[in-house]
């Protein structure tokens, strides 16, 4: 019965391919764009970043992947630890693939077009012949599988490879889904690194810095077999521990349900939410994944997420998060190493996914969070946890359609929820497009809801035209004007992280004022010059209260981070700290040094020298913007996402499970 499902799925895929007039990654046929079709651009990469390291990047995408994922490397190239995925994990050799099939078509190139090239759809007979030819001839089988499962695994691998092969012949990946672009240069993954102690330090580490700096990032375990976006990579946490002048470093995968199963299988089998779930191939991938589940080859019930985006320390738990799953509890050991305790549901209280940017009120120590659903209502829920970890009932937020909500904000009394113009429309996949689309007819708005609300009846929606903030840095109340002030980076084109564009991406630090009395809004740029500012924070001890300073990454030239900026939110004054020629970093983390001035503290940031292929952690005085100390790291640290700092006192109170 299931074999019939497989063949039927292939047949449907073939028919859909014959009817397709647009690329699976192409334009949405039902949307009208007033602006010219933008140039291929991604929030994670541009052409300059793709060519950043000539020692790593061959002339074609397939050559790049074949070279960098091979088990050997030329002695003429820098011996980066990421050049082979046959590295050991937790000192254990990777498991022999349980149903790895032969490689797909090797011809691939990077295209700058949103349109599909003219092609002749493959015949059904040709597709079946390709399936037969691609059935693996290996004798390596997972002993845990019974004969039916082994046969099903080989057939399913062959079907998947045939589909991918045909797609590559039809058109190349766009840059937003091309592995050779998305994991090029220092975005390329690294193997785990057990803890290394007594790292060399230049300068002096301030005595007040006691604890561990942890930062999350995407680090794919396996070579992608199809489309791949930076956000699709497996989560890896990098940790630098400070203990009375001694500094250590370690990096470990977060052992998600997805990663554990794919390690056993020896290949990626879970669908990649951004890089693969586009168009007809995305539909077929979902069908194949469901069929694998029917045969017991995969178990999605333990979660699908990668836990690669955010980190928060709450109630004795360090939580690694991505918005497609529950968080994962990661422990920092006494030696400074990292261990995954498992998927964390707050003692059975959390039944749904949670976004990667929960907020902790610095005074009450409560945690506030959202959960969104792209398939069924309610599309959005709000909830909170007391400082002891007790969850409130869910508050269903009324939305007409599922919306991309990566971040939100809190004030002393309110939560501020964005409902913007980037939405999920799964039927777009049937038309050959992306399920993540920009809806220009929709009006962006912010909802203001009391933190302790038991339902959404009192929520006040205020429109903010043409506003898409991927991140919100802070928000506060100004009672004298009946306004809620929101500080965020407004991004244009809004969907450029997910879909290709010709238009150059801009991220404008903005002040948005929401008048609770009139129901009107205003928006203005905080600084006069156009500088892309993304990834950063304010003093976390003042979150939800009025702050003067924000510390944000200088994503120039986009998408690389050449330094960070200390921005005076009241005057617009900007002070820049530049890492130096050929050096790039990521999110600057502000660590307060005490209860003194708001900017009293230090900036921590990973910096990578692309010429020397070496990474370091820099500590910068946030008051005078001078370098205090540099920690030389034992291995390369890829560019990543968000981090946090856990004090020595909090480390001593870690939960055991």
Curated annotation (Swiss-Prot):
Needed co-factor(s): Fe(2+)
Lineage: Eukaryota, Viridiplantae, Streptophyta, Embryophyta, Tracheophyta
Induction comment from the UniProt entry of this chain: Low induction by drought stress.
EC primary class: oxidoreductase
Cofactor notes: Binds 1 Fe(2+) ion per subunit.
Family classification: Belongs to the carotenoid oxygenase family.
Binding positions for Fe cation per the UniProt entry: 357, 406, 471, 642
Subcellular locations according to the entry: Plastid, Chloroplast stroma
Disruption phenotype: Plants exhibit abscisic-acid-deficient phenotypes in seeds, but not in vegetative tissues.
Keywords recorded for this protein, A-Z: Abscisic acid biosynthesis, Chloroplast, Dioxygenase, Iron, Metal-binding, Oxidoreductase, Plastid, Transit peptide
Pfam hit, one: RPE65
Protein name per the record: 9-cis-epoxycarotenoid dioxygenase NCED9, chloroplastic
Gene Ontology biological process: abscisic acid biosynthetic process; seed dormancy process
Presence of the UniProt keyword Glycosyltransferase in the record: no
GO-annotated cellular components: chloroplast stroma
Tissue-level expression: Expressed in developing siliques, embryo and endosperm.
Function per UniProt: Has a 11,12(11',12') 9-cis epoxycarotenoid cleavage activity. Catalyzes the first step of abscisic-acid biosynthesis from carotenoids. Contributes probably to abscisic acid synthesis for the induction of seed dormancy.
Keyword Metal-binding: yes
Any GO molecular function: metal ion binding
TM stretches of this protein: none
Reactions catalysed: a 9-cis-epoxycarotenoid + O2 = a 12'-apo-carotenal + 2-cis,4-trans-xanthoxin; 9-cis-violaxanthin + O2 = (3S,5R,6S)-5,6-epoxy-3-hydroxy-5,6-dihydro-12'-apo-beta-caroten-12'-al + 2-cis,4-trans-xanthoxin; 9'-cis-neoxanthin + O2 = (3S,5R,6R)-3,5-dihydroxy-6,7-didehydro-5,6-dihydro-12'-apo-beta-caroten-12'-al + 2-cis,4-trans-xanthoxin
EC number assigned by the record: 1.13.11.51
InterPro entries: Carotenoid_Oase
């Amino acid at each position: 019965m299931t074999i019939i499902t497989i063949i039927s799925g292939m047949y449907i895929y073939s028919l859909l391919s014959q009817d397709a007039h647009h690329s699976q990654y192409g334009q949405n046929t039902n949307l009208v764009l007033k602006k010219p079709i933008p140039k291929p651009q991604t929030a994670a990469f541009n052409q300059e970043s793709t060519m950043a390291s000539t020692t790593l990047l061959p002339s074609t995408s397939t050559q790049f992947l074949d070279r960098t994922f091979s088990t050997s490397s030329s002695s003429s190239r820098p011996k980066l630890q990421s050049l082979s995925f046959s590295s050991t994990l937790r000192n254990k050799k990777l498991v022999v693939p349980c149903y790895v099939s032969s490689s797909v078509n090797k011809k691939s190139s990077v295209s700058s077009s949103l349109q599909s090239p003219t092609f002749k759809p493959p015949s059904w007979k040709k597709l079946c012949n390709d399936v037969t030819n691609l059935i693996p001839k290996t004798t390596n089988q997972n002993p845990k599988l019974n004969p039916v499962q082994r046969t099903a695994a080989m057939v399913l691998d062959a079907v998947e490879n045939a589909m991918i092969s045909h797609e590559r012949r039809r058109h190349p990946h766009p840059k937003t889904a091309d592995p050779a672009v998305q994991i090029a240069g220092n975005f390329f993954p690294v193997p785990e690194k057990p803890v290394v102690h007594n790292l060399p330090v230049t300068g002096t580490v301030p005595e007040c810095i006691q604890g561990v700096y942890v930062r999350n990032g995407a680090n794919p375990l396996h070579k992608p077999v199809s489309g791949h976006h930076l956000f699709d990579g497996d989560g890896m946490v990098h940790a630098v521990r400070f203990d009375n002048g001694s500094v250590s470093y370690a990096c470990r995968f977060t052992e998600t349900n997805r990663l554990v199963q794919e390690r056993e299988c020896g290949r990626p089998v879970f669908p990649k939410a951004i890089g693969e779930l586009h168009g007809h191939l995305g539909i077929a991938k979902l069908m194949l994944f469901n069929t694998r589940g029917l045969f017991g080859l995969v178990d999605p019930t333990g979660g699908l997420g990668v836990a690669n985006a955010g980190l928060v320390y709450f109630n004795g738990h360090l939580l690694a998060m991505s918005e497609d799953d529950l968080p994962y509890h990661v422990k920092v050991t006494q030696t400074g190493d990292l261990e995954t305790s498992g998927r964390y549901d707050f003692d059975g209280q959390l039944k749904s996914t949670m976004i990667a940017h929960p907020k902790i009120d610095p005074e009450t120590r409560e945690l506030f969070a959202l959960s969104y659903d792209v398939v069924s209502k309610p599309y959005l829920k709000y909830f909170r946890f007391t400082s002891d970890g007790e969850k409130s009932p869910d508050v269903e937020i009324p939305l007409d359609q599922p919306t991309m909500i990566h971040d939100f904000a809190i004030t002393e009394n309110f939560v501020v929820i964005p409902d913007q113009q980037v939405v999920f429309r799964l039927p777009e996949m049937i038309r050959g497009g992306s399920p993540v689309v920009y809806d220009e007819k929709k009006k962006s708005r912010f909802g203001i809801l009391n933190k302790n609300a038991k339902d959404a009846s009192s929520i006040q929606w205020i429109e903010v035209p043409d506003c898409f903030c991927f991140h919100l840095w802070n928000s506060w109340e100004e009672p004298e004007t009946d306004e809620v002030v929101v500080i965020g980076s407004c991004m244009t084109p809004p969907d450029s992280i997910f879909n290709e564009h010709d238009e150059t991406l801009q991220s404008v630090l903005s002040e948005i004022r929401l008048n609770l009395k009139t129901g009107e809004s205003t928006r203005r740029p905080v600084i006069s010059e156009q500088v892309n500012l993304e990834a950063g924070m304010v003093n976390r001890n003042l979150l939800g209260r009025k702050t003067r300073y924000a510390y944000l990454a200088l994503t120039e030239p986009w998408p690389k981070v050449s330094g960070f900026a200390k921005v005076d939110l009241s005057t617009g004054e900007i002070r820049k700290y530049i890492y130096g020629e050929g050096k790039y970093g990521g999110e600057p983390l502000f660590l307060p040094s005490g209860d003194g001035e708001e900017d009293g503290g230090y900036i921590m940031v990973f910096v990578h020298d692309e010429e020397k292929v070496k990474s370091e952690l820099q500590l910068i005085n946030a008051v005078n913007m001078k370098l205090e100390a540099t920690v030389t790291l034992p291995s390369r640290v890829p560019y990543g996402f968000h981090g946090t700092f856990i004090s020595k006192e909090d480390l001593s109170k870690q939960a055991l499970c």
